[in-house]
Amino acid sequence: MGEIFSEQSLNVQTVSDGVTASTTAQANGVSVGVTNADAAVTSNQDNQGVVYGHSVVDVAASAGASSAVRTTAVGNAAALSASNGTISAFAVQTNSAGVTARGQVEAATAEAADLTVSTLAMGNSAGVTLDNGSAGARISQSTTANVLADGGAIVGYVSGTSAVTATTAGNNINVTGANQSAVRAITDQANTADVTQASKFTAYGNSYMTATAATATGNNLAVSNDGPLADVAAHQWNTSYVRGQAEGTSYLFGAAQTTAYAAGNSARSTMSGPKSCSTTFRPIRAAASRRPPASAGTRAMTR
């Protein structure tokens, strides 16, 4: 597969309502949903091409009342859903090429009221959504290439709220059930990339409320179900160097928050209602044990 690029650049002088920029780069995607029916799914996704998504918004004077810049890059994506039905699935996702999402706002001499800059990068992502449904799934994910979400914002004056976030996962699985759903699943996640990184950098002249956050996870599994059964066996293997880096500065500010989070393996489950829940985790190696590569931590605010 060849390289996949999705880029856009907006040059704004002055706008009243706001600016919206959305950029998505994705190599492979599959979506299967059933309503009042049953389905059996077999999916094999293999990405070998670089995936790159980039958004740049330049503002000379004013970004207006509410602006949003969203950038997403994903190697392989799968979405499975059942409403009043049953879905059985066998899904394999393999990513062996770099995935990068970069979103930035350049407004050093401009003002903005409310601003949102969100950047998401994932090597493999799979989701199972149920509404009074049931699912039996075997999902295997493997990524061997670097995954990066990066960028930031430079703004002269923020009169409202500015939220700038970066989220990265080598492998990601979300299982969500509602209205008396039931699920049985076996998940395997292996991340052997050199680097899995989320980084955001912000600089403000004057600001009212700001939040800068970076979240990086080698392998992530989240299970949430409202129903009688959730039986999940999870196996996670990570040898990647995982880095979360967030930096924020403001000359004058009302309230400012900067958070950074990094984890080699993460597994969370939330259950409600009568249930039987069995979850087994097998983390083999955490990323923190590795030394950072020479290129890790470099800023990427330049184009």
From Swiss-Prot:
Keyword Amino-acid biosynthesis: no
Compositionally biased intervals (Low complexity): 282-303
Coiled-coil ranges from the UniProt annotation: none
InterPro entries assigned to the protein according to its UniProt record, in alphabetical order: Holdfast_HfaD
Disulfide bonds: none
Membrane topology classification: Peripheral membrane protein
Entry superkingdom: Bacteria
Subcellular location: Cell outer membrane
Gene Ontology BP term (one): cell adhesion
Tagged with keyword NAD: no
GO cellular component: cell outer membrane
Function: Involved in attachment of the holdfast to the cell. The holdfast is a structure that allows the bacteria to firmly adhere to surfaces.
Protein name: Holdfast attachment protein D
Source species taxonomy: Bacteria, Pseudomonadati, Pseudomonadota, Alphaproteobacteria, Caulobacterales
